[in-house]
Amino acid sequence: MSKTSSRPTVGIVCGSGLGGLAELLNDRQTFKYADIPNFPQSTVHGHAGQLVFGTLNGKACVCMQGRFHLYEGYPVQKVALPMRVFKLMGVETVILTNAAGGLNRDYKVGDVMIIKDHINLPGFAGVNPLVGPNRDRFGVRFPPMSDAYDRDLCKLARVVAAELDLSQFMREGVYCVVGGPSFETIAECLMLHRLGADAVGMSTVHEVIVARHAGMRCLAMSLITNLSVMDYESQAKANHEEVLETARQRATQLERLVGTLVGRL
């Protein structure tokens, strides 16, 4: 914080292939993760690995160009560490994006799902970023998660999408996080769909848990970059290149959506 005069109130986390959101910021100041003491490093293609400060529609923002995942070998607490850094900077609202596989049979590639709730599958086995001694300076020992995704922000996202004529590909649903890096099997996809998940991915949830623990409001959106395979006769296979290509095609509209949203906060 000694190297920037910016005091952001909005934090933005860019998902795979969506790092262009950071380019929307004015008066940008960029710091590589490698130059930040004790900060993890991005190792995934499509994640630039830098923290960008600036303003967006009059709001002071900090943007993560690249996030961290369990499959990179980081402890879950390290994956979500940036959320506590955000809190200490003064961030009040976090907007998170990710790339996800569609489980809902009504979804299409290129749809954007506003996350209304999540299933923390690794959490069933104790993989939760709040495990260990509670950091009382951030929040309580047992934080509720029934309001993890701010309902007013979700409503605002729908309103803004309608104003920008983007409603035709907007959805709202439940996101399930898995550990990765292997994509899900057919049986796993069928199970997750029956559990009530509309989309599946490998990020976001751990960040949201820590952000909510610290009292920040959260809005999260998934870009549906592939449809999960749930048919044993299908020859389709998920791949990361497909994820990045879909993100590239939808990037401009997502940037407009997020930029307008930030201006309304």
What feature does the model see in each segment?
Residues F183-M230:
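A C-terminal functional module that forms or caps the active site or interfaces directly
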